[in-house]
Amino acid sequence: MRIARFVVDADPLYGVVEEQKVHTLAGDPFFQGIKPTGQSHELEDVRLVAPIIPRSKVVAFGRTYRKHAEELGNEVPPEPIMFLKPNTSVVGHNEPVTLPSFSDEVSFEGELAVVIGRICKDVPVEKVPEVIFGYTAANDLTARDAQRSDLQWARAKGFDGSCPLGPWIETELDNPDDIGIVTRVNGEVKQDGSTSELIWSVHELVARASEAFTLLPGDVILTGTPAGVGEVREGDRVEVDVEEIGSLGNIFRR
């Protein structure tokens, strides 16, 4: 099932996407379940927004793909690197991203994101499927120059618009550990990888995040990016295509 968040006239609504229609839901599916209102819209007549604005946090992992660590000249860490992105970093499909004034070197990072569905802490790996609401595509934008110069990654990873998510949440994947991720810049393929290349499985990463933090409904976990990252420039359109989910696209401006 695909759960979208969209705007028709005013406030954002949730809906179930089926083919070229979106069927409106009553309230918030994270807390009130899937309750159709009976109203539907053509998908082309609505504006998709970020499928979730995390109420609490985005937990992100770095250097979870060996080849990506190597392309940046980094060693593979014994434990995955964990950091946070604020909810103000989240934007949706087709929303423009303003490049930060403090950086001249912003990179794209196409990723699979996990959306949490219930309050949880210290979740064993085998229990992780019980706390997952679904999955979406993500672009973990990174100001590389700030990442190198700053002692912490807060500015480099957390600037406004640095976490595009979308286009919707897919509640079921056949196998989260075998999902293709393709990132294109202006139509040219830059990343072509798979979660099968992850050093730690998707469920292991969720379990590790729950060891560090209490996870809340709507929290998002970014699982890391495969090799092929590169810079994005003003006017570029970056598309992250995640198998079984769809394509997340954003245009960049100054």
What do these predicted regions represent?
Residues 1-80, 172, 176, 182-184, ...:
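N-terminal non-catalytic cap/leader segment that marks the start of a structured domain
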Residues 48-50, 71-73, 97-106, 120-127, ...:
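A generic local secondary-structure boundary/capping motif
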Residues 51, 68, 76, 144-254:
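Catalytic-pocket segment enriched in acidic/His residues
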Residues 69, 93, 123-125, 145-146:
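Short helix/loop capping segments that flank catalytic or ligand/cofactor-binding pockets
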Residues 73-79, 125-136:
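Short Gly/aromatic-enriched secondary-structure transition segments
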Residues 76-93, 108, 239-244:
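Structural signature of FAD isoalloxazine-binding scaffolds in flavoprotein oxidoreductases
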Residues 110-112:
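Ligand-binding beta-strand-loop-alpha-helix segment within the catalytic cores
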